[in-house]
């Protein structure tokens, strides 16, 4: 039975007569978890099934999505091993679900790779840095989030020609995670929940950024603070026949039928019921003037996602909301657990629990018989381009993300359980480095098979993906057992080949990713 550091997913039950376990009890429970899985074993990666087909797992996620957009999703994932990794949250969750874990549960992001951290505005219009994607959020093993994060740094480093700095980045992220847990352990419940990280300041005392990191942060923050609602409205709207309308830009932004627009508008009524009374009051003066469909992200391509233009008191008072489909969490699927909340509500509750401050208009609804969540579209949002994370900037960003993840796990629950398991953190850092290397190699092999599947016509991409690796992605199981050294060498060769071929086609494919891709 897992030890949960947080309240179970709703409905929440609070017993004011029953005290929460003491710090000593929590740490003892965490230390006891080492008997189930020692800290060195946390760094082991071995696929439970040598014959597993990563392509099947990745494409199974798309079965319930809009078929016409799946080739675009495939093309975006095919840019590089890192973009493949971004779109393969279900694959990694499935892999981790086949491995032993500590038994200590936390509220997870569920997809905590480095590109799912970023900048957004607090209600006071202060730019804050935090996790910004909770599509896969769920209760689950805390270490899954950390493994997802550290592996993403290895893949991004390799993609940027910074493989030599990847170990430092991974160990730094793991160390920062433990530092955040220790800091939050000294605070009360409310203090933890309200602990925020300003986007333009180092995340912790005693941390000194290099000039390169400072320059990158300042540039990203400077861009983000200009992306207000007014800026967003200007980007996504135009005046047609004297009236404001959403700017159609296929295939990323497309028009919808009147019937769909009416359904989306109707879905905002139950959405209002998910908001607090004062939030509902804020929206009472707005009415819907236009609706469009938007293609988002990498792994999310193919889900239903709408942008809604609302008008308030004149043309200067416009608001853009995003109505985004939520699916079953990859974490829940991997653990074989039934969901306790509607998918959209799960995303919202996970955001509330893990973020220092959340979008004031965050809520949930139902549409097309599917679950959705609603939020503002791009209110002072910004993110760091992985391609710019080189040298000390890569390591500095690793610290920022690891620290932020530690804060998020602590806000949602009690850090003493996890600290009881990890101890001072040196063993954890070593384990994360060993795991991240091994799983990055696995991802590159899986990426190679994904590219092969595209070129063989097994799956369709919106535009030609990088050339298939010259060798097959996986050696037969018998040969692998007979010659383990040969297998390791072959795996490295294949991984290197996949990286080189991906880089050769990266320029063209990167344009596809940035623009939204060719029309399916």
Set out the residue ranges of the language-model regions.
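Long, low-complexity segments enriched in small/aliphatic residues
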Residues: 197-267
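Compositionally biased, low-complexity repeat tracts
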Residues: 6, 26, 89, 230, ...
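Polar low-complexity intrinsically disordered regions enriched in Ser/Thr and small residues
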Residues: 33, 237, 245, 409, ...
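Conserved ATP-binding subdomain of kinase catalytic cores across diverse folds
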Residues: 18-109, 114-225, 270-467, 471
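Polybasic, lysine-enriched low-complexity intrinsically disordered terminal tails
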Residues: 1-13, 21, 28, 35, ...
């Amino acid at each position: 039975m897992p030890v949960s550091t947080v309240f179970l997913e709703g409905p929440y039950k609070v017993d004011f007569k029953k005290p929460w376990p003491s710090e000593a009890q929590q740490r003892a429970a965490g230390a006891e978890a080492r008997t189930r899985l020692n800290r060195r074993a946390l760094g082991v990666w071995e696929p439970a099934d040598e014959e597993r087909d990563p392509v099947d797992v990745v494409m199974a996620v798309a079965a319930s999505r809009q078929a016409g957009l799946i080739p675009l999703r495939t093309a975006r994932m095919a840019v590089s091993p890192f973009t493949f990794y971004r779109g393969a949250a279900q694959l990694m969750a499935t892999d981790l679900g086949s491995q032993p874990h500590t038994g200590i549960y936390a509220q997870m992001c569920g997809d905590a790779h480095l590109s799912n951290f970023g900048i957004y505005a607090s209600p006071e219009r202060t730019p804050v840095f935090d996790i910004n994607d909770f599509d896969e959020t769920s209760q689950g093993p805390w270490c899954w989030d950390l493994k997802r994060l550290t592996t993403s740094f290895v893949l991004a480093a390799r993609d940027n020609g910074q493989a030599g700095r990847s170990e430092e980045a991974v160990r730094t992220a793991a160390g920062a995670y433990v530092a955040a847990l220790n800091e939050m352990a000294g605070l009360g419940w409310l203090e933890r929940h309200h602990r925020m990280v300003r986007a333009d300041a180092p995340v912790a005392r005693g941390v000194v950024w290099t000039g390169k990191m400072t320059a990158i942060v300042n540039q990203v923050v400077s861009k983000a603070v200009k992306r207000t609602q007014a800026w967003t409205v200007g980007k996504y709207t135009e005046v047609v026949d004297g009236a404001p309308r959403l700017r159609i830009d296929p295939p990323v932004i497309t028009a919808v039928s009147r019937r769909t627009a009416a359904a989306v508008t109707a879905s905002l009524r139950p959405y209002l019921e998910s908001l607090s009374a004062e939030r509902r009051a804020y929206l009472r003066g707005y009415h819907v003037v236009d609706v469009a469909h938007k293609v988002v992200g990498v792994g999310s391509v193919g889900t239903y996602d709408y942008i809604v233009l609302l008008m308030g008191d004149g043309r200067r008072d416009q608001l853009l909301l995003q109505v985004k489909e939520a699916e079953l969490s990859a974490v829940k699927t991997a653990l074989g657990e039934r969901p306790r909340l509607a998918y959209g509500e799960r995303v919202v509750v996970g955001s509330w629990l893990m973020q220092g401050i959340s979008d004031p208009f965050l809520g949930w609804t139902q549409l097309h018989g599917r679950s959705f969540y609603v939020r503002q579209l791009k209110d002072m949002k910004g993110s760091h381009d992985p391609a710019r994370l080189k040298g000390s900037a890569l390591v500095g960003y690793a610290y920022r993300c690891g620290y932020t993840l530690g804060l998020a796990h602590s806000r949602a629950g009690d850090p003493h359980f996890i600290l009881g398991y990890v101890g001072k953190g040196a063993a954890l850092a070593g384990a994360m480095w060993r795991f991240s290397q091994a799983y990055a190699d696995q991802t590159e092999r899986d990426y190679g098979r994904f590219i092969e599947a595209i070129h063989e016509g097994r799956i369709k991409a919106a535009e030609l993906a990088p050339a298939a690796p010259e060798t097959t992605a996986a050696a037969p199981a018998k040969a692998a057992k007979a010659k383990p050294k040969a297998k390791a060498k072959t795996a490295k060769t294949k991984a290197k080949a996949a990286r080189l071929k991906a880089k050769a086609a990266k320029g063209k494919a990167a344009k596809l990713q940035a623009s939204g891709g060719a029309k399916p």
